[in-house]
């Protein structure tokens, strides 16, 4: 399959461990693809929940997916600053239909003031029992929480203000076309 190019629009689908569709984002604009990563942007993007509810994203958000890390990162660009929502999730796959990954419930939220919070621990424990997450997945996810916190603390990749500035500026240029 050919990789999507800069300016292409793709669909993103998140699933649960049991294979059920969790959430879909329509028309994410691709900013960059490499062999292992995809950077995109959602701006007033239609999101459909598994129960059929629909909503539209409120602000531009740079999205980062990687094929080797068990997380993805959403950098929400607001007037008050950039805040982050990080999903602990399987590395993504890309097929002709969509970019797809498994959402493993745990999330890390980083507020514009730098405060960090680990979210949905109870939901993770509940789903781990219900869906029989294997021990190795549990270990990998917990190790990737550590990697993610390290990236946050070191302002690495998407957590760097220059990264956000570069990709947001590129999005604004592409949007004018």
Curated annotation (Swiss-Prot):
Q: Which residues bind Mg(2+) 2?
A: 105, 107, 120, 123
- The organism encoding this protein is Streptococcus agalactiae serotype V (strain ATCC BAA-611 / 2603 V/R)
Q: What is its EC number?
A: 3.6.1.15, 3.6.1.6
Q: Is Protein biosynthesis tagged as a keyword?
A: no
- The record places the active site at 23 (proton donor)
Pfam families named in the record: DUF402
- Broad EC category: hydrolase
What is the protein name stated in its UniProt record? Answer: Nucleoside triphosphate/diphosphate phosphatase
GO MF annotations in UniProt: magnesium ion binding; nucleoside diphosphate phosphatase activity; ribonucleoside triphosphate phosphatase activity
Record-linked InterPro entries: DUF402 (IPR007295), FomD-like_sf (IPR035930), Ntdp-like (IPR050212), SA1684 (IPR016882)
Q: Which UniProt keywords apply?
A: Hydrolase, Magnesium, Metal-binding
């Amino acid at each position: 399959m050919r990789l999507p190019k800069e300016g292409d629009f793709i669909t993103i689908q998140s699933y649960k461990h049991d294979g059920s569709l969790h959430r879909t984002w329509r028309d994410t604009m691709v900013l960059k693809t490499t062999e292992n990563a995809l950077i995109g942007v959602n701006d007033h993007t239609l999101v459909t929940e598994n129960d059929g509810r629909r909503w539209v994203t409120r602000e531009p958000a740079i999205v980062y997916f990687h094929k080797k890390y068990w997380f993805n990162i959403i950098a929400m660009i607001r007037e008050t600053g950039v805040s982050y929502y990080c999903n602990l999730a399987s590395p993504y796959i890309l097929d002709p239909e969509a970019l797809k990954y498994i959402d493993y419930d745990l999330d890390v939220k980083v507020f514009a003031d730098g405060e960090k919070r680990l979210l949905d621990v109870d939901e993770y424990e509940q789903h781990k029992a219900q869906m029989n997450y294997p021990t190795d997945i549990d270990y990998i996810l917990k190790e990737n929480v550590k990697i993610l916190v390290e990236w946050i603390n070191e302002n690495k990749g998407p957590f760097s203000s220059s990264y956000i500035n570069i990709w947001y500026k590129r999005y604004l240029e592409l949007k004018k076309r």
